[in-house]
């Protein structure tokens, strides 16, 4: 673990005497498909701890990472190079003690409490074990006797399905979108658990990101631009064929840039369809493609999630932050988020 350096001895306010962050990849410091001690120190939770001048212990992961982050977006080279191990494990603790960043990459709305028996409980992936050591996020949080808590959870309830282009749960392809009823149960269990921690004096609940605005999804219509098409083909490692019937300049579909990697690896044919092909199920045109109807479904689900989170923040006396207006503004500015990934 590591303690964030602070300039003064005391926090800016007693409210921040002990700050704990609960969440998933973004909170943990996961970047570029990997995580290590450098990316962990760039987490917004670490930056916030510095702003309020409070000690903040993070469960450091040795370089090159677990897994190592991508060092080159085009070639997909990893930090540490071709010989890098898939996981360099946790760093040794100089001074054992409670951790303040209990977030785990891949966590869903169920994860902080792990209250329901099943595969999505205490042990979801190796990082769950390395970071939490067999406990839940809430249990680990309570050990730090937090006075202030931030919670950003729920993105993974919709992200994987949005990026795969398949909204129903489909083994080997998509985790599916968590139903609003299930999300409600999970989140209320989390709030109930937070209310049971007597040291908490305040906090903030952060809303779920509308995943149609994530930078890795780009407008399929851009592929009609030869420059964009050339850049995509370079990433795919071959000249791809654009289906003229579904990929017209007027299409509103979104494409996950990971489609290029799937084509390069041979997992997807070098033909791009921008709309779903006929049922019962045709992966081409479905996988990695989010059409107009799917975008509406995702947006409606996220809106329902966030209405619940805002209401639960009120019951706790916490602040609620909706990240979507700021993220949408960033994506609308090509100087901040390029229309096509680069």
Q: What are the roles of these predicted feature ranges?
A:
Residues 1-17:
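Bacterial Sec-dependent N-terminal signal peptides
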Residues 15-18, 56, 144-149, 197-203, ...:
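Loop/turn elements at helix/coil->beta-strand transitions in domains of secreted/extracellular proteins
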Residues 19-33:
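Catalytic nucleophile-elbow at a beta strand-turn-alpha helix junction centered on a G-D-S/GDSL motif
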Residues 22-25, 151-156, 163-164, 206-210, ...:
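Active-site-proximal beta-strand/loop segments in catalytic clefts of secreted hydrolases
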Residues 30-35, 60, 160-165, 214-219, ...:
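Short, solvent-exposed loop/turn and secondary-structure capping segments
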Residues 35-189:
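Conserved SGNH/GDSL esterase-like catalytic core that processes O-acyl groups on lipids
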Residues 217-300, 304-342:
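Mobile gating loops/cap/lid regions near enzyme active sites that modulate substrate access
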């Amino acid at each position: 673990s590591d303690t964030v350096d602070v300039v003064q001895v005391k926090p800016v306010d007693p409210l921040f005497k002990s700050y704990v962050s609960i969440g998933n990849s973004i909170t943990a410091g996961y970047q570029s498909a990997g995580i290590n001690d450098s990316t962990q120190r760039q987490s917004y939770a670490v930056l916030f701890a510095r702003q309020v001048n409070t000690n903040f212990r993070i469960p450091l992961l040795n370089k090159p990472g677990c897994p190592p982050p991508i060092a080159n977006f085009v070639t997909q080279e990893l930090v540490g190079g071709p010989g890098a191990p898939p996981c360099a494990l946790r760093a040794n603790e100089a001074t054992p003690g409670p951790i303040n960043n209990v977030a785990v990459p891949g966590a869903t709305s169920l994860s902080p409490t792990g209250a329901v028996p099943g595969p999505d409980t205490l042990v979801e992936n190796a990082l769950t074990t390395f970071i939490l050591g067999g406990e839940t996020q809430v249990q680990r949080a309570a050990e730090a006797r937090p006075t202030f808590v931030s919670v950003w959870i729920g993105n993974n309830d919709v992200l994987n399905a949005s990026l795969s282009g398949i909204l129903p749960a489909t083994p080997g392809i998509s985790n599916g979108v968590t139903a609003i009823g299930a999300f409600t149960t999970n989140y209320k269990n989390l709030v109930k658990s937070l209310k049971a921690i007597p040291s908490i004096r305040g906090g903030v609940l952060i809303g779920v990101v509308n995943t149609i605005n994530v930078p890795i999804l780009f407008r399929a219509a851009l592929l009609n631009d030869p420059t964009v098409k050339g850049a995509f083909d370079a990433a795919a490692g071959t000249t791809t064929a654009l289906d003229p019937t579904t990929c017209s300049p007027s299409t509103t579909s979104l494409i996950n840039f990971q489609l290029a990697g799937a084509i390069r690896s041979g997992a997807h044919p070098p033909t791009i369809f921008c709309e779903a092909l006929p049922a019962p199920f045709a992966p081409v045109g479905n996988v990695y493609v989010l059409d107009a109807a799917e975008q509406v479904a995702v947006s409606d689900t996220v809106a329902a999630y966030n209405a619940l989170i805002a209401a639960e923040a009120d019951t706790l006396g916490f602040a609620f932050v909706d990240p979507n207006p700021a993220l949408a503004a960033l994506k609308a500015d090509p100087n901040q988020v390029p229309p096509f990934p680069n």
